[in-house]
């Protein structure tokens, strides 16, 4: 069976998908390279919000946490519990990775509904949530793939690849393709849900600009949080699976 060509074709498909565009986009030209300016600008805004919130909340840590410090300690405890549940007792080193994924996606998703991106004019296109662009979701999914490959190899060494011939060598092609389709499912799930939510709100606002869009926006905030949780949970589950063996 042509397993290697098939895997190479799958990776090429992921690269091609990262170039998919919805609507017009604004680029920065740096030499011979085009930089996707919209994604970078909105991602920097999200990162600034996260870093600024953390700095403000813990700039004066107290033995008995109050207000912002208490909130971030609760968030950290939640992420630790999530990581431990999905990865197991060796979850500790992966808490920063899972936490970063969850918080970045969560704030990115909410920024699409809460921040007035549309009022900022660009030469081409318009600003939107970072996760509204498939380049962002594919990048996050590929980072997750690299993480679970690293987790498996660091735990088991080259014996990690034995999982591809279990329970029978006949399943080798399917087991290989499974690892390359995980990024596809993660990226499309997140991208599709966030894009659909923003499109629904835009359509309703254009049709009934006053009352009707408000409940839909609240529903969008709820589903955006759920999508961040699903992505982080699946990322942790994939890492745990690579460390424990193929199920």
UniProtKB/Swiss-Prot annotation:
It is a multi-pass membrane protein. GO terms for molecular function: proton-transporting ATP synthase activity, rotational mechanism. InterPro entries: ATP_syn_F0_a_bact/chloroplast, ATP_synth_F0_asu, ATP_synth_F0_asu_AS, F0_ATP_A_sf. It comes from the Eukaryota. It is found in: Plastid, Chloroplast thylakoid membrane. The keyword Chloroplast applies. The chain crosses the membrane at residues 38-58, 95-115, 134-154, 199-219, 220-240. This is ATP synthase subunit a, chloroplastic. It comes from Lolium perenne. The gene is atpI.
């Amino acid at each position: 069976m042509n397993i290697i060509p098939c895997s190479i074709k799958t990776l090429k498909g992921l690269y091609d998908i990262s170039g998919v565009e919805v609507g017009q986009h604004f680029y920065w030209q740096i030499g011979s390279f085009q930089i996707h300016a919209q994604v970078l600008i909105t991602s920097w805004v999200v990162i600034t919000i996260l870093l600024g919130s953390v700095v403000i909340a813990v700039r004066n840590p107290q033995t008995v946490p109050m207000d912002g410090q208490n909130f971030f300690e609760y968030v950290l405890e939640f992420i630790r519990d999530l990581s431990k549940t999905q990865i197991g007792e060796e979850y500790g080193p992966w808490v920063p990775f899972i936490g970063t994924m969850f918080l970045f996606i969560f704030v990115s998703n909410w920024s699409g509904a809460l921040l007035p991106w549309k009022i900022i004019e660009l030469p081409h296109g318009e600003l939107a949530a970072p996760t509204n662009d498939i380049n962002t979701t594919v990048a996050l999914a590929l980072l997750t793939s690299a993480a679970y490959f690293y987790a498996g190899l660091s735990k088991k060494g080259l014996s990690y690849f034995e999982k591809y011939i279990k329970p029978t060598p006949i399943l080798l092609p399917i087991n290989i393709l499974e690892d390359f389709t995980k990024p596809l499912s993660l990226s499309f799930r997140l991208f599709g849900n966030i894009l659909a939510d923003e499109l629904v709100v835009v359509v309703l606002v254009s049709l009934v600009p006053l009352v009707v869009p408000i409940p839909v926006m609240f529903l969008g905030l709820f589903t955006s949080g759920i999508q961040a949780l699903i992505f982080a949970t699946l990322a942790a589950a994939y890492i745990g699976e690579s460390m424990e063996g193929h199920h």
